[in-house]
Amino acid sequence: MTLFLTSSPCDNNVPEGLDLPCIFDACNGFVENLRASVEPGAQLLIIASDPDAFAGNDEMAATFEGCFAAAEIELEDVCVLDSRNADDAAELVAQSGVILLSGGHVPTENAFFASMDLRNLLADFDGVIIGISAGSMNCADTVYAQPEEPGEAVDPDYQRFISGLGLTTRNILPHYNQVKDNVLDGLRLFEDITAADSAGHTFYILPDGSYILARDGDEMLCGEAWLMHNGVLEKLTEDGEELTL
């Protein structure tokens, strides 16, 4: 299995003439590494974060089909996995060469994954998995579901650590440049909430365009990143750099 744990792999600077909302971001070798990993003619399975958001899921599938085409990565077919065909999850996973785990609300996506027993379905998967945002977060063995929606930071019943897909031990926190100054329920997202939750835990904090590439037991951090552990935030890498984990 080859695993890409991304914040967002999307670049909104679309070349003239392409009718797409975004293309894959070539920064930090992402497109090059993806091309080298995907078998030509593979089937792409996009697993939704919200299983009932049919229109949005179909729109996302069309967008990423275009992203692969723009990156000159040949696909045989593109399929969405949501509540319309969740009963066929095992078959769809088995016939896919590339699986994309969508971004969205971490607990919502996590519950959908669990309802299909996706952790076991992916245990022997030998293709390429691309996590995006929440999808990357849910790849962890134990997921840190950083509070995101109003009320979650002060809800004593909100579960911040939940069982994930077990594809990595790394906890990813995405979109750092966009959310680093956010305030949720009167608390600063990183200084007040995440720093306290990092006691005994390690979080890899990524801006869009950065990712972790895991293959054959090796893990490489590609692009700018920070690490938070026991309440301390430190810069790990700059954009364009790589770090073996």
Residue spans for each PLM region:
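C-terminal and late-domain segments of enzyme folds
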Residues: 1-40, 58, 62, 145, ...
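An anion/phosphate-binding loop that grips the pyrophosphate of nucleotide cofactors and donors
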Residues: 96
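Catalytic nucleophile loop
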Residues: 100-102, 123-142
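Catalytic-core regions built around general acid/base machinery
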Residues: 92, 115-126
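ATP/NTP phosphate-donor binding region
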Residues: 16-92
